[in-house]
Amino acid sequence: MHGKLLPLAGLYLVQGLPYGLQSSLLPILLRARGLSLTRVGLTKGLYAPWLLKLAWAPLVDRRGTPRVWLTLSTLSLGLVCGLLAVLPPPQAGQTGLPTTVMGLLLLLNLGAAVQDVALDTLAVQLLEPKELGPGNTVQVVAYKLGSALAGGGLLVLFPTLSWPLLFLLLAATYWLAAALAWAAPALGRLPWPQASEHTPHSSYLLQDLLAVPGTLWTAGFVLTYKLGEQGAGSLFPLLLLDHGASASDLGLWSGLGAVTCSIAGSSLGGALLARHWQPLKLLKTVLQLRLGSLACQTALLFHLNSPGASVDPGTVMRGAVLLSLCLQQFFGGVVTTATFTVMMHCSQLAPRALQATHYSFLATLELLGKLLLGTLAGVLADSLGPHLCFAVFLVLSALPVLDLRLAPSNLT
């Protein structure tokens, strides 16, 4: 099993780099340069290629092997990072990202989205049912580690690490990962698709996807389970910045510290699943804990507006805020690992020729749910105010707890 998990870990790690770059590093840098919460939030529209994965998932199902797709897409990611290295960084006083930088970041997301389809195809085909728990733990932990390194890690180093050196470092990482994708023995053993296995070209593809047992419920769950968490997670660090926290502090708190807790949560989730915990039972417990944690974070936000409240070093509020960030990420990590295990189990119920497309369909809905609130959180905060906005997030976080009562028996 280690021969399968090690290359998966390396490839999922580099897959998390663009997400960390755009979810942690760029928003804080842009907010520190004076952009509104709305403008900062709307930069997440650069994730749009991830929502179009179904456009090329059937092609990955029918043409070539995961190793070929992984190698080519990862090489292209290194090339885009090399081009970003020669461009100047965003400057103070700019109203947004330069058009050229936005275009290259869009290409970066396109390459990462193609890589994601190929990598998920490999995982669905490579892992046995008993390996789903450890496999999804590796997937989530490695992805979050890559996100933390590209987000919080680079944010801490950014005052001393130049923009060109940052992207040259990322380019070298991608090219090493491309070599891993090509050389890993486990990836070369997967067979080329046979003609009889091809996904049919028909207008009934969506009908075929929804006909897979458990798909309707899983699709609804993954679309909603992160709405409240993602909205709060996107907005809370920016509000802390407005209350006096520095960008380097937030790099440590919401980048490295909180993501470390998220990785710990994902690891715990994987360990519990490996000990034969049912994913849906685990979700029921942890979703309730996550809801309570978000309620505490909302109370902290209200207290921050009271006279004398501060997140200065040595204050109780600073410790409470840090604990709040860590708890949300920890519970979110457990929830993510269990949810991805449910998704992969559901996709394995599909015919082999449809598995990559089916998993991409679920993963696209999962990402859409996260992007929806991550992108609109700033707009909601500017229009409703942060307090009412967090009340909405609490209601949204309660929805998946209720949704679990409708889960089909074939996913338990």
From Swiss-Prot:
In brain, expressed in the cortex, striatum, hippocampus, hypothalamus, thalamus and cerebellum (at protein level). Widely expressed with highest levels in kidney and liver. CDD domains: MFS_MFSD3 (cd17485). Pfam families: MFS_1. Induction: After 24 hours of starvation, up-regulated in the brainstem and cerebellum and down-regulated in the hypothalamus. Following 8 weeks of high-fat diet, down-regulated in the brainstem. It is found in: Membrane. Its main location: membrane. It comes from the Eukaryota. GO terms for cellular component: membrane. The chain crosses the membrane at residues 10-30, 40-60, 68-88, 99-119, 152-172, 173-193, 204-224, 252-272, 291-311, 320-340, 361-381, 384-404. GO terms for molecular function: transmembrane transporter activity. InterPro entries: AmpG_permease/AT-1, MFS, MFS_trans_sf. The keyword Coiled coil does not apply. It is a multi-pass membrane protein. Coiled coil: none annotated. Keywords: Membrane, Transmembrane, Transmembrane helix, Transport. The keyword Nucleotide-binding does not apply. Belongs to the major facilitator superfamily. This is Major facilitator superfamily domain-containing protein 3. It comes from Mus musculus (Mouse).
